[in-house]
């Protein structure tokens, strides 16, 4: 008898040996030992309190910036969805959003409430939880500019509130990445503005994204962080990797490729494995370093075991 046969009772769903590929935008990767879809915050807390503390736990959102390796993920993967997707305007140009709220939805709700400053979220294909953890940003703005506080839950099911200062935001990073905490919701603050003007700016961002990024492909968004003084897409492009296919097995062609539309977007053309995608990323990193002396660091989160 293993821990998987002795899981705590829940009101949500427990899926044993569940494939993770459908939970990510890349559509690759092996299974999780267990996927837990909590009904709400209390369901999540009760589960964590009762779960064997030796079992690893990882929370995910919509999997838009996530690469799951082909061997799958040990322990419990918590997928936050219903029960964590409410948005509430608080007054004083503040708005609260659950961790499972898509960033673009938060931007739209803020616009409707006349709160400016969150427009850039219209260009980020993730959720509030992920944006908080990685300090997501684009077009000159980032989460650190607008976040006031976040409520988080630890491995024991205990909840506490952290201020923006306590999150220690830096470029595409926060203290949450190393703390094993699950974001429940966050409060943001913007500036008062006319809803129509805000929506017009959001429309510009959405249009720009649609014409410059492969948003209809199986992708994980920006693959590499921008090194100081450089643009990752330009380094990848100048190294000759735009549109070039790759297979980890060494076969000609392959299903992994850096997008012809935007060379910092790694895409699965339909037949790639996680090993192909990660292998291409690491090959490009090594090639760029050899040619330019510039180190590219992954922005996409890679989890799990190789096959």
Curated annotation (Swiss-Prot):
The active-site annotation reads 172, 222 (proton donor), 299
Q: Which cofactor does it need?
A: FAD
Q: Where does the record place it?
A: Cytoplasm
Q: What superkingdom does the record give?
A: Bacteria
Q: Which UniProt keywords apply?
A: Cell cycle, Cell division, Cell shape, Cell wall biogenesis/degradation, Cytoplasm, FAD, Flavoprotein, NADP, Oxidoreductase, Peptidoglycan synthesis
- The residues covered by the FAD-binding PCMH-type domain are 27-193
GO cellular component terms, A-Z: cytosol
One of the protein's GO biological processes: cell wall organization
Q: What general EC class does the enzyme of this chain belong to?
A: oxidoreductase
A GO MF term? FAD binding
The record's EC number reads: 1.3.1.98
Pathway it belongs to? Cell wall biogenesis; peptidoglycan biosynthesis
Q: Which reaction does it catalyse?
A: UDP-N-acetyl-alpha-D-muramate + NADP(+) = UDP-N-acetyl-3-O-(1-carboxyvinyl)-alpha-D-glucosamine + NADPH + H(+)
Q: Does the keyword NADP apply?
A: yes
Q: Name one Pfam family in it.
A: FAD_binding_4
The role this protein plays is: Cell wall formation.
Q: Which family does it belong to?
A: Belongs to the MurB family.
* Protein name as it appears in the record: UDP-N-acetylenolpyruvoylglucosamine reductase
- Record the organism: Caulobacter sp. (strain K31)
Origin organism lineage: Bacteria, Pseudomonadati, Pseudomonadota, Alphaproteobacteria, Caulobacterales
